Every structure is written in C-alpha cells, then in structure tokens.
Amino acid sequence: MNDIGRIIAAACLVAALLFPAADARAQTDARQAWSAASGSIFEVEPTWPGYQKPGFGAPAGTAPEGTGIAILRPGLLVTAAHVVSKATEVHVRTPDGTRLVATVLAIDQKTDVAFLPVGIETTPIALAQERPETGAPVCALSNAFGLGIGITCGVVSASRRTGVGFNHTEDFIQTDASVNPGSSGGALIDLEGRLVGLLSAIFTKDSDSDIGVNFAVSTELMLESLPQNFR
C-alpha cells in the first residue's frame, strides 16, 4: 500500500470510530432534552367559526391544531397568536392526555404570541438565560400535524433574524429543526431542555411544510408580550 492509500485508510478508520460516537451522543442529548421539557408541552385545539378543513384527527369544524408551553407559573401557557386569534373556543390536551378548556388571556398580534390560563397545576419549562449561538444544537417539541407531541432536532441557523416579514415586530431564532403545521406555539429548546424560543413560522414558497428554514420568537420578545400583572 502506498502512502496515499495508507492516509485514506487511516482517515476511514478515524471516521468509523468517531462518527458513531458523535451520533450516539446526539441521540443521548435529544433524549435528555425530551425528558427535561416534554412535561411542559401541551397540544392546543382551537375551534374556528366556519372552518371546513380540520387538521388530521381533529373533529369537524375545528381548526388545525397547535402547541402550547407551560411557562413561568403554574396554570399559564403560551402559544402562537395565529393558532388562537380566530378561535371561538380553545381546548388543550395535557401531557397525560387530559383535555381541558382554556381561555385566552392576551394576544399580541405584533409578535405572534398569546397566553392561555388553564385550570390545573402545570410544570413551567425552564428558560435559557442566554440566546443560543449560531450553530448551537437545538430541538423542537411540538404537535406537528396534530399527531401529538414529538421532537425533532437541528441547529441554530441564525441566532437573530429580523425583517423576515411574518410579524410586525420580529426577533427570531432561525433553525433547521423540522417544523410543520401544528408546530406553531411549540418549544425550541437547548439540549438541557431550556426554552430558547416559541415556534412561530415556516419559510416556504410552495406549501406549508418544512424545508429547513424555520423561525422561533425569542424568549426575550415572548416575555415582553406578557401582561404586566403576570411578569
């Protein structure tokens, strides 16, 4: 074997040894993130007047489902405003499957954030103290297509995006973690399970499906939208 052949063989051996270990670590981190945060994630089931095209598994007359996050204090959820802004009523489904009526406390259309009190004790999600850096690993916990809460993972594609054109006031974290209809209002978390953003928008020109350019409202902007008496 010549020198080039030896170099190639050595490189292949290193890749074989390192990549499975890296993949295993990523899977472990995702499991840890899920374990830390999933107990704070709710399915949101709005009913919109005159809606004729229910989401997967939704009763006739209801709108496509969304997601909500327990935050700050027991009994308070946050979701995307566009999930509930047209709703005549809103139900949520807890992590253990209990279905409850929720009320809409406040809607901030400028930031696409809404707050929902629910009549039970909830486990608020931990909040990240710092904005994640570009390239940092993150996971999205959401109710994609109304199928129930699940997890997808990726990286922060950009730590701060403004002027995208979805909302009047924007402070987005961009990610390639998979996001789809039903994910709105879900949690973008770090690998410790701490909230870094509220899933809000999918950038696509052809259909409402994931192409890897997705946006979450930063926790800083989300908290600015909270009514004063709840801060």
Segments and roles (model prediction):
Residues 27-36, 44, 48, 140, ...:
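C-terminal cap/linker of serine protease catalytic domains
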Residues 49-50, 65, 72-149, 223, ...:
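Conserved active-site neighborhood of the chymotrypsin/trypsin-like protease fold
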Residues 69, 178-199:
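Catalytic nucleophile loop of clan PA
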Residues 1-11:
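Bacterial N-terminal signal peptides that target proteins for export
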Residues 53-61, 105-112, 159-173, 205-209, ...:
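Gly/Ser-enriched beta-turn/beta-hairpin loop segments
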Residues 22-26:
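Sec/Tat signal peptide C-region and signal peptidase I cleavage site
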Residues 9-20:
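Bacterial N-terminal signal peptides
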Residues 29-33, 83, 124-130, 134-170, ...:
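Flexible, gly/ser-rich surface segments that form the specificity/activation loops bordering the active-site cleft
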